[in-house]
């Protein structure tokens, strides 16, 4: 919060209750982080990536899909995705019967769907702010699966606990 504005300085009380005095000329030449939006929105952003081994990405066998249907969060996804892919592959005619031409369900896509559904059902993830799970550009450490969401508590220690719980 800005506590004082003078001709040559602006005094700000930081989120940790420390006070910073900024020369007014610095307001033009440098950038500053304003935490007020976070406080007023009621959500604190989580933006982290899990790096997955690209060599582990593969198609799921029907028996694996059946086993994954026991996960409540995946049941609807698998049913919908199987119908979508069956329709797509049927549109290819005889070519759709060849595995090389057909679209199939992967462990990566299924994991991404699970993570997204897990976050949407997590009681400490803010329901009214952006939530997405996406793949980023692959690199030497693997294929990053980015988790982007907001907690429903902005207090630092609580936020860190929620973030740790999600990634544990």
Predicted stretch roles:
Residues 1-95:
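Soluble accessory domains appended to multi-pass membrane transport proteins
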Residues 160-168:
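Short, non-transmembrane amphipathic alpha-helical segments
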Residues 95-101, 142-155:
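Short, hydrophobic beta-strand segments
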Residues 93-116:
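Intrinsically disordered, low-complexity acidic Ser/Thr-rich regulatory segments
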Residues 129-146:
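Short edge beta-strands and adjacent turn/loop segments
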Residues 119-130:
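Short secondary-structure junctions
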Residues 51-53, 134, 146-150:
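Residue-level recognition of well-ordered beta-strand positions that form the cores
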Residues 59-62, 155-159:
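Short, conserved charged micro-motifs
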């Amino acid at each position: 919060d800005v506590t004082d504005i003078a001709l040559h300085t602006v005094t700000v009380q930081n989120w940790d209750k420390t006070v910073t005095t900024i020369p007014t000329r610095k307001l033009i030449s440098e950038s500053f982080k304003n935490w007020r939006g976070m406080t007023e929105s009621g959500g604190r952003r989580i933006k982290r990536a899990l790096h997955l081994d690209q060599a582990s990405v593969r198609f799921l066998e029907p028996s694996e899909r059946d086993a994954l249907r026991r996960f409540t969060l995946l049941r609807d996804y698998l049913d919908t995705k199987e119908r979508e892919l069956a329709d797509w592959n049927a549109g290819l005619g005889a070519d759709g019967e060849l595995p090389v031409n057909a679209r199939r369900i992967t462990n990566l896509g299924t994991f991404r769907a699970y993570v997204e559904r897990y976050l949407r059902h997590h009681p400490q993830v803010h329901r009214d702010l952006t939530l997405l799970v996406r793949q980023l550009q692959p690199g030497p450490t693997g294929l990053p699966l980015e988790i982007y969401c907001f907690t429903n508590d902005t207090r630092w220690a609580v936020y860190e606990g929620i973030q740790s719980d999600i990634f544990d």
